[in-house]
Curated annotation (Swiss-Prot):
One of its GO terms (cellular component) is chloroplast. HAMAP family: Ribosomal_uL2_B. It is found in: Plastid, Chloroplast. InterPro entries: NA-bd_OB-fold (IPR012340), Rib_uL2_dom2 (IPR014722), Ribosomal_uL2 (IPR002171), Ribosomal_uL2_bac/org-type (IPR005880), Ribosomal_uL2_C (IPR022669), Ribosomal_uL2_CS (IPR022671), Ribosomal_uL2_dom3 (IPR014726), Ribosomal_uL2_RNA-bd_dom (IPR022666). This is Large ribosomal subunit protein uL2cz/uL2cy. It comes from Olimarabidopsis pumila. Part of the 50S ribosomal subunit. The lineage of its organism: Eukaryota, Viridiplantae, Streptophyta, Embryophyta, Tracheophyta.
Length: 274
């Protein structure tokens, strides 16, 4: 990813660093509208995810996470920006005339060919079952349920590693550091997700953050007591508690929130590192 720095003419360009190469020109048959009337709200209109709202209108790009066009070679035609994720997407023209979007693998360029199937080469961008991959392969867009499509390692720069295969399961090390078991019949894509330098971008001003649909985050200690348990006091007062809590009074910063009896508890060999 090429980071473009502007001349220092205004505060926004003085502090900003954006990607100047990838543009967006989606195909009409691969996009659809989204319903965002109350961002961060549930069906009752109550805020369930704070600091969200506003933002520019978006069109959803239909991404092929299943990669079920078996043994049909496709060619990368474009590499595009997707406002719904921090990874890039690329348009694939398949040999049978079908066109689909997939996540852009790191290092893939326009003109490269990809294919999915059971006996395909271990090449960046190809999709195949875990049972056909050698140990140590870097993968992304990993299925959890067979045929449902990739659900793991889909963010920009994400990559997992196949570290073992035994019986009907394969052992993966995920980007979070978690080590877990997945069926060997599930498929994944070889390589790493592109746009690795997404964290190097600097928005430069608060307005650019609002375009993304993100609102300001206010500390509880500067609020009033009616708004947050940390609020109140004269001047810069401490929180007045032994440990910090959430706006609803539950313990924060360290309390484990995962349910103890989840079905995947036996599949996780090592918890993710924090």
């Amino acid at each position: 990813m090429a980071i473009h720095l502007y001349k220092t003419s205004t505060p926004s360009t003085r502090n900003g660093a954006v990607d100047s190469q990838v543009k967006s020109n989606p195909r009409n048959n691969l996009i659809c509208g989204q319903h965002h009337c109350g961002k961060g709200r549930n069906a009752r209109g109550i805020i369930t995810a704070r600091h969200r709202g506003g933002g520019h209108k978006r069109l959803y790009r239909k991404i092929d996470f299943r990669r079920n066009a078996k043994d049909i070679y496709g060619r990368i035609v474009t590499i595009e920006y997707d406002p719904n994720r921090n990874a890039y997407i690329c348009l694939i023209h398949y040999g049978d005339g079908e066109k689909r979007y997939i996540l852009h693998p790191r290092g893939a360029i326009i003109g490269d060919t990809i294919v999915s199937g059971t006996e395909v080469p271990i090449k960046m961008g190809n999709a195949l079952p875990l049972t056909d991959m050698p140990l140590g392969t870097a993968i992304h867009n990993i299925e959890i349920t067979l045929g449902k499509g990739g659900q793991l390692a889909r963010a920009a720069g994400a990559v997992a590693k196949l570290i073992a295969k035994e019986g009907k399961s394969a052992t993966l090390k995920l980007p979070s550091g978690e080590v877990r078991l997945i069926s060997k019949n599930c498929s994944a894509t070889v390589g790493q997700v592109g746009n690795v330098g997404v964290n190097q971008k600097s928005l430069g001003r608060a307005g650019s953050k609002r375009w993304l649909g993100k609102r300001p985050v206010v500390r509880g200690v500067v609020m009033n007591p009616v708004d947050h348990p940390h609020g109140g006091g004269e001047g810069r007062a401490p929180i007045g508690r032994k440990k910090p809590v959430t706006p609803w009074g539950y313990p924060a910063l360290g309390r484990r929130t995962r349910k103890r009896k989840k079905y995947s508890e036996t599949l996780i060999l090592r918890r993710r590192s924090k």
